[in-house]
Amino acid sequence: MSAEVIHQVEEALDTDEKEMLLFLCRDVAIDVVPPNVRDLLDILRERGKLSVGDLAELLYRVRRFDLLKRILKMDRKAVETHLLRNPHLVSDYRVLMAEIGEDLDKSDVSSLIFLMKDYMGRGKISKEKSFLDLVVELEKLNLVAPDQLDLLEKCLKNIHRIDLKTKIQKYKQSVQGAGTSYRNVLQAAIQKSLKDPSNNFRLHNGRSKEQRLKEQLGAQQEPVKKSIQESEAFLPQSIPEERYKMKSKPLGICLIIDCIGNETELLRDTFTSLGYEVQKFLHLSMHGISQILGQFACMPEHRDYDSFVCVLVSRGGSQSVYGVDQTHSGLPLHHIRRMFMGDSCPYLAGKPKMFFIQNYVVSEGQLEDSSLLEVDGPAMKNVEFKAQKRGLCTVHREADFFWSLCTADMSLLEQSHSSPSLYLQCLSQKLRQERKRPLLDLHIELNGYMYDWNSRVSAKEKYYVWLQHTLRKKLILSYT
């Protein structure tokens, strides 16, 4: 996306449209708060999150269909078709909030601000603020989130906007089946700490196992005070006792991409012993990683298997992997997850998709200039729409993910290039010795071990573990 196009869009939007666009993208550029639309779009462009389709989606969301036609040469119907067939840049939650804001008049917003004083405190937000400003403040106080809309629903009822209350209820029903919850901005902003592991980022697993388990299952209501790997940022409020089916032989494909070369044998032996068909690839570039992931995401063999595992070991940045390349940016981690969402990878819809990522973070001084790799999943398009038409994708597209990311300093490899990752060693040991226990429980104990390790070593030797999941059932990596 060129700077000229960004400039044209920014100039054409009015104040309200700019406010809406900034709000819609709060979950997309989570580690920065850009002051204006031009800076926001420029940041997204630099990070590879502003393809023509992405910009078309944003213009569609702010209802500037004239700009779609004049600047992007697309009509409304083409964008709607694109949104049906591709992962969305903007979450359904943000779209819902923006739509509610459009349907409220000034007196409605004033009434909502008044009602919220009981929860926010007086003077927290002025009467002149918009509904979207109010939502942002409520998010900061953890009073509103994608899976926490009861307060807003109650207040809409109190101002007699039953139509908007009903809209929220429909949204809840649409995501309830998936048991999924999204990050709100305040929770997700803690991810900035991953850019500098020494920047006040500590594992908080020194508490008792009972406390950690309560936090893991969402019993605590103050996610900002939790460690990232145990926050409610991407967790359902509870995990039902129902178990994922694990009966296929093999249980599924385990894809190992090791761009360092230290982990392959250990991981292969572990997942083979668990009943997975292991396929491994060594020393790939970031384009090679993207290509392999795209191929595996659309494999029809997934139809016959009950789960999927991907282990990725690479050098990278805080939110991307480089493979063997020397680059400033690389393949964004969120693009990897998008490749395997239910609407892009229909044969794995409703099945657990586990990702274990060891990322050795490289300082910027060691890198060459590059740009983020644009990943749009072309290899999946032909499978995707046909499968959706057959009704394979019946759960929320972001459901059933287990995403475990460990970052460590690149200097660990320089000290001992042949030494495996402590995180992956511990994970392998847990999986082999205690496979009949729930994966979440094993990961909590793994976090505790990493916390103990970090308390004894220097900053450069520490491992920082971050867990997100949207599991709807109990996950045990053993035949049921």
Swiss-Prot record:
Region: Interaction with CASP3, residue numbers: 192-435
Region ranges (Interaction with TRAF1 and TRAF2): 192-480
Superkingdom per UniProt: Eukaryota
UniProt keyword annotations, A-Z: Apoptosis, Host-virus interaction, Repeat
Induction: Repressed by IL2/interleukin-2 after TCR stimulation, during progression to the S phase of the cell cycle.
GO biological process: apoptotic process; cellular response to dexamethasone stimulus; cellular response to epidermal growth factor stimulus; cellular response to estradiol stimulus; cellular response to hypoxia; cellular response to insulin stimulus; cellular response to nitric oxide; extrinsic apoptotic signaling pathway via death domain receptors
Annotated segments matching region Caspase: 263-358
Annotated region described as Interaction with FADD, given as residue ranges: 1-227
Gene3D superfamilies for this protein: 3.40.50.1460, Death Domain, Fas (1.10.533.10)
Family statement drawn from the similarity comment of this UniProt entry: Belongs to the peptidase C14A family.
Subunit organization: TNFRSF6 stimulation triggers recruitment to the death-inducing signaling complex (DISC) formed by TNFRSF6, FADD and CASP8. A proteolytic fragment (p43) stays associated with the DISC. Also interacts with FADD, CASP8, CASP3, TRAF1, TRAF2 and Bcl-X(L) (in vitro). Interacts with RIPK1.
Protein name per Swiss-Prot or TrEMBL: CASP8 and FADD-like apoptosis regulator
